[in-house]
A protein has these predicted regions:
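NAD(P)+-binding Rossmann beta1-loop-alpha1 motif at the extreme N-terminus of oxidoreductases
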Residues: 1-48
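Phosphate-coordination loops involved in phosphoryl transfer and adenosine-cofactor binding
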Residues: 8-10, 77, 122
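Short, well-ordered alpha-helices that flank and scaffold nucleotide-derived cofactor binding pockets
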Residues: 21, 25, 29, 66, ...
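Internal alpha-helical scaffold of NAD(P)-dependent oxidoreductase catalytic cores
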Residues: 23, 95, 101, 117-208
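Rossmann-like NAD(P)(H) cofactor-binding subdomain of soluble oxidoreductases
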Residues: 40-116
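Interdomain hinge/lid region at the active-site interface
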Residues: 204-265
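NAD(P)-dependent dehydrogenase/reductase Rossmann-like domain
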Residues: 256, 264-282
């Protein structure tokens, strides 16, 4: 039996920053009636929506929820969700009793600019909270082409730190890589256009192959000579990047050992080149 299509809700997004604006644009592109309101304009007199999305800073989620409750602007039939990764649904507790339910709806996607809507298809959304709000949030995620997931007992701070480590860390590493490319005579305006596809290929490998198989490069191959050349070049051209390169290579070693494309002695040699004991144990 075919699965029934999720009904199209009306959505009100409060907060016109990077995430809120991009989310509103993505919803409209998929035929969802969406109202976007900047937080600096304050609350409207009334909200006509089935789903109210708070896309504000973490510290503002609770206070905004309290103001919405006190102003009585949320329809009793509506659900309210926030998009913070570090806060669970309890941040919206002030609104319980004045709406149909509250939930966390955090897209594990990087939103860097209100002018760029990132690819949402195949992305994941963590949803947690009251049953009715969770159901509507999951339906909204599916309409965006994303996969809704719920992890009972999730440590929200650790979850958010993991997302930040990958998303923010990758952007920072790419910036360092772009600087090294510039010092290797690649035009600065070209470097981002080279590194973007490279990062997408890494993302594809991570998604499709998982770990440790997503790893590539000299550490996986056990190529200590290649790694030492990299370190020497970095020391000459961009010495401030050496600690980053060493830390990244150290993180690769357990993956490379698990893959086993080279003898253990090769990985021991890499560990010594990085200034670490030959084995981490085992």
């Amino acid at each position: 039996m075919a699965r029934r299509a999720d009904p199209t809700p009306a959505v009100f997004v409060f907060g016109a920053g990077k995430l809120g604006t991009a989310l509103a644009r993505a919803l409209r592109a998929r035929g969802v009636a969406t109202t976007l309101r900047a937080a600096r304009k304050g609350l409207p007199r009334t909200i006509r929506a089935d789903v109210v999305v708070l896309a504000v800073r973490d510290r503002d989620v609770g206070p905004v929820a309290e103001r919405m409750r006190d102003a009585g602007v949320v329809p009793v039939r509506a659900v309210v969700v926030h998009v913070s990764g570090a806060l669970d649904a309890e941040a919206l507790a002030p609104l319980r009793g004045s709406c149909a339910g509250v939930a966390q709806m955090h897209p594990m996607i990087s939103f860097a600019s209100p002018d760029v809507v990132p690819g949402l298809a195949r992305g994941n959304v963590h949803v947690q909270g009251d049953a009715r709000a969770v159901a509507r949030a999951r339906a909204l995620a599916r309409r965006l082409g994303m996969t809704p997931r719920t992890f009972p007992g999730l440590d929200a701070v650790a979850y958010h730190a993991a997302a930040g480590l990958v998303a923010n860390g990758a952007a920072a590493l790419a910036a360092v890589g772009a600087e090294l490319l510039a010092r290797a005579s690649v035009p600065r305006d070209v470097a981002p256009r080279m590194l973007g596809p490279l990062l997408r290929s890494v993302a594809d490998n991570v998604e499709k192959l998982g770990f440790p198989r997503a790893l590539t490069g000299p550490v996986r191959r056990g190529d200590v000579a290649g790694l030492e050349k990299h370190l020497a070049t970095l020391l000459a051209k961009l010495p401030e990047a050496v600690p980053l390169y060493r830390a990244a290579a150290e993180a690769q070693l357990p993956l490379a050992r698990a893959i086993g494309d080279a003898p253990a002695e090769s990985f021991d040699a890499i560990a010594r080149a990085l200034g670490r004991p030959a084995r981490d144990g085992g």
